[in-house]
């Protein structure tokens, strides 16, 4: 994204190469040996479409973009397209080059023709070398309503006309609207004084050049003169003996050279070379005796201050501009998280916004665009400003990207989601897939279940999986966000069987096999599979436990995993039953393990129990473990290394499904 802004607003065509075209359109260039004018016009283009909101008092600046229906609004919407497109003479020039290539080949001796590689072999070969002369910048007026189409890019038909009569006039108009500054990801900062990297002191000295005033400071000029006189007096004394001898030297063409030394000091150079940044390491008033050079404070903090100084400089230069100042000042900050610890990353956006706000007046507003791979950077941000770039694949396997506008997230509870994601550091936005679990036990043990089975779950082990503990009653609240982001998602939840006791007025927890039992889990009732009766849930096949997310360009799947009936033996008898919760399934599917470790867990099994009695004992124990469910999970975690247990079947099934989904996406 930053590359596109730099390309279209700095207009350095040399920055663009053939590889900036999406690989999905390369076939339209490769193998093309003949090209007509009509075919050239259909060649791929690189576009940047912009939608601007303009206050009424600034409408005169965007008259070229406005239509009559905007005149009744206080804020007008205008749109324009910046395009890198084939020149009108591309086909002609390419065919001339091809003709010359064929002619050159024919002129080769017959023995060498087979080895001779004429240029260009095809259109791809031609553009590899001539892209910057074969393509040009174009500018169009767009219909702003075209931006309202959800999930759709602006089509060629959305352009309502050329922006100006000439490219030069169009560029001048665009420059009068938008000025873009870049804070690059590679900031060349270093703690090593001998390195070629920058430090804050060098940056501060550069800042002096930007902030230089045309007014003469007479007091500073007088001080500089006095300094020159003192320095000259010192230098004359030091060189007096040497120059006295040199002045007596005579030779061919040399007569009494009369050398002298004088002090010449440049105010700018003197200030620049004497500007060094120090940090005070002790609290209290400024004390030169308690300061250290900047290299002792760490690259993270230096990077942080560097970006703030850059933003401040950029705003000052834009606000101090003469003539027609661009209406919009956009500062694009690329991956600010470099070298910064998580806490500083979390504070960065808030501090940067406050820093910009201090510089602003009623008419000078700098806007920030921040690209990041860090969940900490968006820690203190609402949904509205977030644009989520989801990597996906076209049907032919071409890598692509879909941009989702989180301000359009359709949910009745955005405040809950925002607060929850803030607590979990927003890792969901940077994940390859998401697993939603009910409680502490699953959150503690699930990573262990994945890591100890890399052969069966290679994609899960190597991918970035966001594990969110959402609680049984809250998983459903994540449905809009999971669908919106389009990530493969696995919801691991519980059957939570309940039944009405005799003479009761309220359903209570019961064994899964209780007649007439239903689930109290709203995820199963309102999301997937959309059923309430326990017996129906247990009979649901795998296909009924997944749902296709149909939002966005590339749909993804969501699957639910809950307890299923499994066969176990106890007291010489075989039984077929399902646990009500994760903990019940863990114990019922690891009975042999419990024989050896029951005492450590705090639940020793009686060999004389019938299978039905055993299920009831497990149910009663899990309802109220002696030291709580979290402690039970930690005990299971601690014992695993010396005595591994088996992952419950329903979780194995769900993890295998998610691994296959990630494997399928990797193949695409």
Model-derived regions, located:
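N-terminal cofactor/phosphate-binding cores enriched in small/glycine residues
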Residues: 1-23
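Glycine-rich phosphate-binding loops of NTPases
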Residues: 18-43, 56-219, 409, 508-550
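Hydrophobic positions in the central parallel beta-sheet of the AAA+
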Residues: 181, 331-333, 435
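Conserved nucleotide-binding/hydrolysis micro-motifs of P-loop NTPases
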Residues: 54-57, 85-90, 187-190, 337, ...
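Short alpha-helical segments and helix-capping/turn motifs at coil-helix boundaries
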Residues: 32-36, 62-68, 153-173, 260-263, ...
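Acidic, Mg2+-coordinating catalytic modules of nucleic-acid enzymes
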Residues: 418-436, 440-668
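Switch/communication elements of ASCE P-loop NTPase nucleotide-binding domains
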Residues: 1-9, 278-424, 638-668
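Extended helical coiled-coil dimerization/tether regions that scaffold
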Residues: 185-333, 360
